[in-house]
Curated annotation (Swiss-Prot):
One of its GO terms (cellular component) is ribosome. GO terms for biological process: translation. This is Small ribosomal subunit protein bS21. Keywords: Ribonucleoprotein, Ribosomal protein. Pfam families: Ribosomal_S21. Gene3D superfamilies: Ribosomal protein S8. One of its GO terms (molecular function) is structural constituent of ribosome.
Length: 65
């Protein structure tokens, strides 16, 4: 549970904005969406290998220019 202390005379909009910023930093929504669908570890590993190969090809392409 997030606790946001409100200072004396602080605008409620500012306190709400601080709460939203802190909520985003915790990554609760991101984690919830990630857990909604299970992805097999082999699929994750394959995607990581494909991404690494893509990035490597991009870097090699930039070096040749």
């Amino acid at each position: 549970m997030l606790i946001i202390p409100i200072k004396d005379g602080e605008n409620i909009d500012r306190a709400l904005k601080r709460y939203k910023r802190k909520f985003d930093k915790t990554g609760v929504v991101r984690q919830l969406r990630k857990r909604q669908a299970f992805i097999k570890p082999s699929v994750i590993n394959r995607a990581m290998i494909q991404k690494a190969a893509y990035v490597q090809n991009m870097r090699e392409g930039l070096e040749n220019m």
